[in-house]
């Protein structure tokens, strides 16, 4: 099949007008949040003008101020979004008003070609619209949500009675031979934006896994927008002093004062407290440690796309081996199970696969040795199938 026909056959429709409406609703909601952030920023600036604040409190306030300012700037950038996509929306509306309707019986080749060209123009606008989302940090979730709606191949028609096997002009639900104009039914596997709310449970689990893994990547770099109560830092500082883990010489910088403090130490202290209110911050340990000690977080931004691609492959292999089975055990040695492997366990293994240096102690993995061995067994098998390098060195 020529490149021309392949392009037409390999793209699925996306209703960017509905997506645009969803984005407008999101921007309206965010506008209310910005009012709250601006009020918070005023209070922070007032506090910073006070005298005799402890250095750690000043540092914390400056961090909060920086985060608020960043979020406000990112929101104000959304003011340019409507201007940026206005011409695309207008062209899309015009194409909708000039929709090509084929006669029910025996459409001519010219009519089919006109309809195909019309669809190509719409799909080109859809791609341009989705590419615009990449320029706006606040709209990344919309870009991620729509990825699965693009480039979904349709079923290929059987050979035509005239002998043609490749030259077809395809519509949503039919294919017409470009040589003799014979029409065939075509089962379409496309999805639209409205289909997002009607995905089956398997797709829901897959989506939730990936969202959870993305959160894990964000938390590992300490980039999540989570508010950590000031009491947490006060408790940590008190406990670290009790354990003689702080350098108490006068005049030291924050980095020097906390240079002996590791993430594992901070996590151990939080666990010692045994409080349910504290337990919910375990996943934020990197952010807490960085804010407290000013020690830098690991930056894996350059690997994020590769990690997400690897995760997709790993998930698909896992489902084929352990979930999508008719019988409890099959010839590949899989055992049907529902739960996926620990996200931080997976992140560590994928970072090691890409030869990224990282400390296994920085990952919240599994408590019991039996569970660790079980995860190693599963993960090693998946990596072996995918022919990836596997590492055992994780706590």
From Swiss-Prot:
Keyword Endoplasmic reticulum assigned: no
Keyword Translocase: no
Protein name (database record): Putative transcription factor 079L
Keyword set, alphabetical order: Activator, Transcription, Transcription regulation
InterPro entries named among the record's database cross-references: Poxvirus_VLTF3
Role summary: Transcription activation.
Membership in a protein family: Belongs to the IIV-6 282R family.
Gene Ontology terms describing biological process: regulation of viral transcription
Coiled coil: none
């Amino acid at each position: 099949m020529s490149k021309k026909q392949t392009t037409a056959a390999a793209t699925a429709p996306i209703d960017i007008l509905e997506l645009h409406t969803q984005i407008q609703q999101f921007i309206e909601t965010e506008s209310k949040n910005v009012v709250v952030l601006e009020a918070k920023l005023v209070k922070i600036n007032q506090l910073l003008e006070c005298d005799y604040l402890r250095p750690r409190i000043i540092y914390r306030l400056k961090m909060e101020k920086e985060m608020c300012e960043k979020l406000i700037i990112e929101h104000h950038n959304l003011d340019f979004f409507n201007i940026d996509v206005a011409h695309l929306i207008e062209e899309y509306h015009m194409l909708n008003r000039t929709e090509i309707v084929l006669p029910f019986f025996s459409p001519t080749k010219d009519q089919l070609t006109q309809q195909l060209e019309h669809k190509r123009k719409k799909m080109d606008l859809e791609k341009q619209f989705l590419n615009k989302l990449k320029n706006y940090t606040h709209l990344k979730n919309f870009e991620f949500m729509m990825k699965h709606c693009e480039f979904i191949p349709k079923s290929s028609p059987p050979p035509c009675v005239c002998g043609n096997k490749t030259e077809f002009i395809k519509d949503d639900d039919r294919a017409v031979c470009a040589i003799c104009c014979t029409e065939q039914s075509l089962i379409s596997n496309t999805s639209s934006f409205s289909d997002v709310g009607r995905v089956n449970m398997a797709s829901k689990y897959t989506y939730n896994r990936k969202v959870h893994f993305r959160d894990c990547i964000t938390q590992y770099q300490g980039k999540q927008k989570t508010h950590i109560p000031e009491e947490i830092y006060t408790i940590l500082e008190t406990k670290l002093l009790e354990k003689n883990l702080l350098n108490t010489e006068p005049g030291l910088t924050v980095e020097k004062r906390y240079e002996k403090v590791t993430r594992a130490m901070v996590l151990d202290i939080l666990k010692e407290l045994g409080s349910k209110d504290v337990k919910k911050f375990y996943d934020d340990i990197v952010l807490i440690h960085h804010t407290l000690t000013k020690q830098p977080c690991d930056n894996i931004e350059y690997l994020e796309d590769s990690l997400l691609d690897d995760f997709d492959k790993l998930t698909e292999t896992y489902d084929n081996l352990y979930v999508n089975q008719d019988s409890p055990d099959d010839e590949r040695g899989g055992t049907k199970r529902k739960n996926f492997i620990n996200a931080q366990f997976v992140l560590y293994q994928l970072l090691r696969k890409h030869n990224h240096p990282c400390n296994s102690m920085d990952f919240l993995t599994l408590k019991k040795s039996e569970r660790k061995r079980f995860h190693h067994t599963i993960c090693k098998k998946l990596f072996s199938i995918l022919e990836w390098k596997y590492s055992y060195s994780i706590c």
